[in-house]
Amino acid sequence: MFRTLVVAAALALAACSGPPAPTFHATDITGAEYGRTLALTDHNGKPRTLDDFRGKVVTVFFGYTQCPDVCPTTLTTMSEVMRRLGPEADRVQVLFVTVDPERDTQALLANYVPAFDPRFLGLRGSLDETAAVAKDFRTFYQKSGDTSGPNYTIDHAAGTYVFDSQGRARLYVKHGETAENIAADIRVLLAGN
């Protein structure tokens, strides 16, 4: 009799606990308050905030157009993610935030970012606006090399932030994650999890 009560109690508790939390390939950052102050201009000259993309899953990557490796690799991976998502990709917005507004003009971003996928948007702001957005995301960037002229490089964090369709930070995707895994994670978010 006691055993029957214990089993019944365990089943009742399991039924009350709700569905299990989704599991992701990327790092789950649900509850983080990133991106609240993102207010930059896109490569078409339109002011943007994350609220502009409510209803879509949004990815945010910080980089620059003269980046020799991480940035083009990440944008290529995100292009493959969009291909894998098929029609669901229309519910995803990829944002590339330049950390080099001195060299990355609106025109340069308009040529560079959509070359990976015409739906992608490049965002830029002043030096101060860029610094404020990076601080809000708790991300790192810094000029390096010969900073006295135009041939400097920029050291920067290489991960991508993913927001759900309600505008909540949900995932941090480390550089090098596969397009297959990123697409799988985005599908979970598109399903409302």
Predicted feature locations:
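Bacterial N-terminal signal peptides that target proteins for export
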Residues: 1-6
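C-terminal motif of bacterial Sec signal peptides marking the signal peptidase cleavage site
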Residues: 12-15
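Bacterial signal peptide processing site
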Residues: 17-20
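Post-signal peptide N-terminal segment of mature Sec-exported envelope proteins
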Residues: 23-47
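A short beta-strand-turn-helix
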Residues: 38-58, 82
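Short active-site neighborhood of thiol/selenol oxidoreductases, capturing the structured segment around
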Residues: 50-74, 78
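Structural microenvironment flanking redox-active thiols in thiol-disulfide oxidoreductases
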Residues: 73-133
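Thiol/disulfide oxidoreductase modules built on the thioredoxin-like
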Residues: 129-185
